[in-house]
Amino acid sequence: MKVLWAALVVALLAGCWADVEPESPLQGKPEPELEPELEPKRELEQEVEAEAGWQAGQPWELALARFWDYLRWVQTLSDQVQEDMLSNQVTQELTTLMEETMKEIKAYRAELEEQLGPMASETQARVAKELQAAQARLRSDMEDVRTRLTQYRGEVQAMLGQSTEELRARFASHMRKLRKRVLRDAEDLQKRLAVYRAGVREGAERSVSSIRERLWPLLEQARTRHANLATQPLRERVDALGQQLRGRLEEVGSRARSHLDEVREQMEEVQAKMEEQANQMRQQVEAFQARLKSWFEPLVEDMQRQWAGLVEKVQVAVGTSPTTPPLETK
């Protein structure tokens, strides 16, 4: 009887994982390229959408929202106040918010691992490894955002004697690398989750096939023995035992199905939250790029005016007619 119960439970496990894995929305869809004149407008729209679409429910999501809110507050300050704060206060505040976010993520991961307690130890280890990798990538991205506020201003000051075209090129390249890294992390996480779920489904199918091969001869023997029973009282007792066994199997199967459905829903919820988090981070980085462009635009224009004035003075000094300074390519 124990063997029959095990066969039914494994069969239910295979049925629960038989759903087809949907294709990831971030896979196979290249990011559309925008015209140069439409890119600032598009980035501004993405920034507004990111702020409106951010819905924080879990404690770690609230902590991450406070991190981005503090960045937006710093960007609204005047240039002089920012220069005074960037050296110490802003870095310390961002470090505190980042550590708070990591602490909440760790607590949420511990809660998830506790919910997956009835699962096999190998499955628990794989889930913990995936979440730990995602947490490490998020920490790296937040540390990079924290250091950009102090590094980029120094780079701009060091490039005052260079052309504005080189300044714009370095700025655009820097932001593209940051955006690509966030997209790469999101796609990598999706691939790892897809491989994990496929492995679990394949293992369940192999287990069901193996148990069927082992139990089929026993079932055939039981049928033969039941058919050869000679007396009616013995048949009645066997029928009663069979009904009792079916009732117990149905009860065990119902409990197993309920638990497996709950575990599958929890895994799908975790995957959906991680995908949503990665998409929101990508939108917020693009919005941050638009803000930095608008921040340093006055500095570039001032450099152009100074250059034009210097050329005009030199031309007047040598007695030549003023010429139009070269225009910056956009």
UniProtKB/Swiss-Prot annotation:
GO terms of molecular function: cholesterol transfer activity; heparin binding; phosphatidylcholine-sterol O-acyltransferase activator activity; phospholipid binding
Keyword field: Chylomicron, Endosome, Extracellular matrix, Glycoprotein, HDL, Heparin-binding, Lipid-binding, Oxidation, Phosphoprotein, Repeat, Secreted, Signal, VLDL
Transport found in the keyword field: no
Keyword Signal: yes
Classification via InterPro entries: ApoA_E, Apolipoprotein_A1/A4/E
Modifications made to the protein after synthesis: APOE exists as multiple glycosylated and sialylated glycoforms within cells and in plasma. The extent of glycosylation and sialylation are tissue and context specific. Glycated in plasma VLDL.
Record region (Specificity for association with VLDL): 291-303
Pfam family for this entry, one: Apolipoprotein
Sequence repeat spans: 96-117, 118-139, 140-161, 162-183, 184-205, 206-227, 247-268
Sequence segments annotated as region (7 X 22 AA approximate tandem repeats): 96-268
Signal sequence annotation: 1-18
Origin: domain of life: Eukaryota
Protein function: APOE is an apolipoprotein, a protein associating with lipid particles, that mainly functions in lipoprotein-mediated lipid transport between organs via the plasma and interstitial fluids. APOE is a core component of plasma lipoproteins and is involved in their production, conversion and clearance. Apolipoproteins are amphipathic molecules that interact both with lipids of the lipoprotein particle core and the aqueous environment of the plasma.
Family: Belongs to the apolipoprotein A1/A4/E family.
Stated name of the protein: Apolipoprotein E
Organism, as annotated: Neomonachus schauinslandi
Lineage: Eukaryota, Metazoa, Chordata, Craniata, Vertebrata
